[in-house]
């Protein structure tokens, strides 16, 4: 029996990825739901993270290169007092705050956050898809091997403190491509002297696209015609498609 290839759909689906799914798994579910023959996404979200996944169908996959280069915005929840090997709540605790730690002072946090705005250097986490000798770093990490990683320059456009409780803070971060928010959380915790990791992460913008227009998988699957959720090629912001 011939394998079904799907429809030759062209357009962009703004998907609100749920927690617990890999970006590729979410993409494949969306692709099947709209019955597209060709699909790709424009930047991975970790399984624990939620939010905007830009899914390109058919000819819209031509914007993928520009979207990978685009700035992104996140809402991140920082948990103070513990650092993990992965930089987020899924990892193992590797460092704790000094005995007697009772939370962070808001003034100290605001001061530290201001130091991370601009061009900074980050050491990529071991739990990442960056490769060494053809193998992703996360495979080395899972085997208990830590490798030296050269620092990389990234740009933090802004950091806004959205909420604060002493042991947790929620921040809004706009950043350049290649920025690891897990590493940012870890570095903020170290600068405060108490350690920190990500308790939650939600992506709200990728280039010109916003989470405000995104649809969940459940809502997509409940639509009578899921193809109606796609942004048509003539609805895409000017300049995204390469010149032909």
From Swiss-Prot:
Active site location: 46 (nucleophile)
EC numbers: 5.4.99.25
Keyword Electron transport: no
Cited NCBIfam families: TruB
Record's protein name: tRNA pseudouridine synthase B
Record's keyword annotation contains Isomerase: yes
Listed Gene3D superfamilies: Pseudouridine synthase
Highest taxon listed in the record's lineage: Bacteria
Phylogenetic classification of the source organism: Bacteria, Pseudomonadati, Pseudomonadota, Betaproteobacteria, Burkholderiales
Keywords per UniProt: Isomerase, tRNA processing
Cited function: Responsible for synthesis of pseudouridine from uracil-55 in the psi GC loop of transfer RNAs.
InterPro entries membership: PsdUridine_synth_cat_dom_sf, PsdUridine_synth_N, tRNA_psdUridine_synth_TruB, TruB_C
Catalytic activity entry: uridine(55) in tRNA = pseudouridine(55) in tRNA
Annotated GO biological process: mRNA pseudouridine synthesis; tRNA pseudouridine synthesis
GO molecular function: RNA binding; tRNA pseudouridine(55) synthase activity
